Amino acid sequence: MSLTYMNMFMAFTISLLGLLMYRAHMMSSLLCLEGMMLSLFVMMTMTILNTHLTLASMIPIILLVFAACEAALGLSLLVMVSTTYGMDYVQNLNLLQC
């Protein structure tokens, strides 16, 4: 395993640990999710470029589309919770009534 792959795997692991440990605030959870998506994108792109898989070259772009949708939904939920309750705690998500 090369040094670049190890760095990206460590970035993914640190983001996952941050998501699991600092889940009280919604903004920190969203930042950890974005870090995980970024490291997954870089690892997938490097793997596809190193193995010369031309048919799988669209997969990282599709991952970026899903990451953008996740970020938009997360930020809209963050704005809704913070304007309604005045704070961005994840515990406030249980109080939402649809």
From Swiss-Prot:
GO terms for molecular function: NADH dehydrogenase (ubiquinone) activity. It comes from the Eukaryota. It holds the Pfam family Oxidored_q2. It is an enzyme of class 7 (translocase). Keywords: Electron transport, Membrane, Mitochondrion, Mitochondrion inner membrane, NAD, Respiratory chain, Translocase, Transmembrane, Transmembrane helix, Transport, Ubiquinone. It catalyses: a ubiquinone + NADH + 5 H(+)(in) = a ubiquinol + NAD(+) + 4 H(+)(out). Its EC number is 7.1.1.2. This is NADH-ubiquinone oxidoreductase chain 4L. It comes from Vampyriscus nymphaeus (Striped yellow-eared bat).
